[in-house]
């Protein structure tokens, strides 16, 4: 779900907008503080890794520390070794996680004396809300009555001033497994948005999922009047959004199957961007001769990629082939601004320049970082195997593929290319051509089993 920012709105001729995500951030921050304060004293915070990124955009570690958090752990299957009596879990309603929490509770209880004062005090908060399945698993594990349970409604995550995300990895559960939980989560998030920013009168949608969501939103509006929300009347009546457009993912399955060719898109392809964060460091090897395999890195450093990085904001949406010239332009601009110091004559001019020094230094540091990343992208993009893959994607997309193009996929399987690369190409072909002929399906299945028996067994189990 997106909303136009001032810069983007002007780009598309929509005029400026005063929309700000500050209210969303503040609501999520206040609720997080309530979650932490619900458990008195010192505590350990155990976070589902998929929630860690969104949480870091809401509150800094200093805020957690102020409200009693002594240690932070990522939720995993291993026993949780900590001296903290109080444990606060913040997790998605994942059935596997419920078993891990139960195992950790039992392990902690076994390591301490049997007196009630020494038993672990566990509180589980679900993001964005609990499910009956999770309750049932906790009951089956025998700990449902021994722990406290609540919800933390971190359902809308502001990634940028013009980009909001639910951060839900729910394509398979919704489209393959038929789990309707996603629709309810999206509906609650949109209602929350309207409570904060005013009612959106017009709903437009395309796709079956969009239709179901629209009908649910209409029912929720009847059951709950946004005018009754805890806002002042000007907020409720003066919403700057007159429409919401809902697009079902199945409307366009081709785009996510193709390699992204913008600068930001290729960073995501090579390094994987998670909630605006990416881990990048100096490569320990050049790009693989088979460019279908990204370069390997060591001593990774976590970076934030958003519009607060002025260099990144200028190049993120550009095609990678023109990024080099833009980086040169940015370098020249920074140099010209730094050279202005030689022309300064008055005290006022000196003070104005001094106020810019910090920003110029940050931009120069950012420029060096993006020059390094761009070099990696060029090595990857210039490899003949990468070019061959992109050419195959282009052919598949236009429905002009032949048996020789399918042989290219067989070649990738034989070279033990990453299974994601193989499956993306196969899925792209199937989406455009309405599936695979039986003889091709049997051939691909046989090759995958022969080359990667362990992988096929893993996929079969899932």
Locations of regions flagged by a protein language model:
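Extended, well-folded catalytic/binding cores that form a central cleft or groove in large enzyme
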Residues: 1-462
């Amino acid at each position: 779900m997106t909303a136009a920012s001032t810069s983007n709105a002007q780009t598309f001729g929509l005029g400026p907008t005063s929309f700000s995500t500050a209210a969303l951030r503040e609501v999520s921050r206040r609720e997080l503080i309530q979650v932490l304060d619900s458990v008195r004293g010192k505590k350990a915070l155990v976070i589902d890794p998929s929630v860690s990124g969104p949480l870091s955009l809401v509150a800094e570690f200093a805020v957690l520390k102020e409200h009693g958090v002594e240690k932070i752990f990522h939720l995993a299957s291993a026993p949780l070794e900590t001296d903290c009596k109080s444990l606060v879990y913040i997790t998605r309603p994942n059935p596997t996680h419920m078993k891990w929490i139960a195992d950790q509770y039992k392990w902690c209880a076994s390591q301490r004396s049997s007196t009630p004062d020494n038993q672990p005090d566990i509180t589980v908060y679900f993001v964005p809300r609990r499910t009956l399945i999770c309750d049932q698993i906790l009951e089956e594990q025998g700990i449902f009555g021994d722990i406290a349970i609540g919800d933390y409604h971190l359902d809308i995550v502001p990634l940028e001033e013009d980009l909001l995300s639910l951060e839900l990895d729910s394509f398979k559960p919704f489209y393959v497994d038929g789990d309707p939980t996603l629709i309810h989560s999206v509906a609650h998030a949109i209602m929350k948005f309207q409570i904060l920013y005013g009612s959106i009168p017009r709903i437009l949608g395309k796709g079956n999922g969009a239709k179901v969501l629209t009908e649910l939103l209409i029912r929720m509006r009847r059951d709950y009047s946004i005018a009754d929300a805890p806002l002042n009347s000007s907020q409720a009546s003066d919403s700057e959004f007159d429409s919401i457009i809902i697009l079902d993912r199945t409307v366009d399955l081709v785009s996510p199957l193709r390699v992204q060719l913008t600068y930001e898109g290729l960073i995501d392809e090579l390094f994987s961007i998670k909630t605006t964060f990416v881990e990048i460091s100096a490569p320990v090897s050049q790009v693989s001769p088979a460019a279908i395999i990204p370069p390997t890195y060591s001593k990774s450093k976590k970076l934030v990629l958003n519009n607060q990085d002025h260099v990144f904001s200028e190049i993120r949406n550009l095609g990678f082939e023109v990024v080099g010239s833009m980086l040169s332009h940015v370098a020249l601009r920074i140099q010209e601004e730094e050279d202005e110091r030689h022309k300064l004559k008055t005290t006022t001019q000196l003070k104005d320049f001094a106020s810019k020094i910090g920003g110029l230094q940050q931009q120069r540091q950012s420029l060096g970082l993006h020059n390094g990343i761009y070099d990696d992208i060029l090595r990857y993009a210039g490899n003949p195997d990468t070019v061959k893959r992109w050419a195959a994607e282009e052919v598949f997309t236009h429905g002009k593929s032949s048996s020789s193009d399918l042989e290219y996929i067989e070649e990738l399987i034989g070279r033990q290319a990453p299974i994601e690369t193989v499956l993306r190409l196969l899925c792209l072909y199937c989406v455009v051509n309405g599936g695979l002929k039986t003889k091709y399906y049997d051939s691909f299945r046989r090759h995958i089993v022969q080359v990667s028996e362990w992988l096929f067994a893993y996929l079969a189990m899932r």
